[in-house]
């Protein structure tokens, strides 16, 4: 898949492969959610590699923030996406809550105000992962400027656009989603000013059915199909701009 890109010197439109950075959530000393002998960091890595394969078959250029079981800081993840001139950043996760009956996928985009308390708690939990590795949380003035003036407003709009496309694809594929599948909060990993970024929760390890479903490659392919189709449709909308 190719997209048009302006050459600053002569304003000629040139084509480059649409580039995606996939971020398998957690890793290394940070296992993420752990339930029923399943670990979030293992499922997200498998899912990211499988999705990478689907996308590369369609001609997309795909990078992973990690290819093995290792810890990557939130800041480094964003830098990897920027270094590779990514057109889209997707952080892949699996959720876990006290209520075992809760199940289904959801997608999150950046906002300075959380859409609900549960999402605010999720963002707070995900934003603390660097502390596990002893990495101090930095005071980042850039982040505040992003949230205050929404630098590159198109980035926020593009992220929301992808989220809505994903929700529709999930429903069309008959995959279970939360009642309000698109939510917003201040996820640190999504704070790139010029790269549309989303965080996708594939399901809930705290739910026995979801846990079994996501730990199996064949059944996991269903939600990855919806995610890959969302990417295909999103690229089509961006190529028209």
Q: What are these model-predicted stretches?
A:
Residues 21, 148-241:
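Active-site-adjacent mobile loop/cap segments within catalytic or ligand-binding domains
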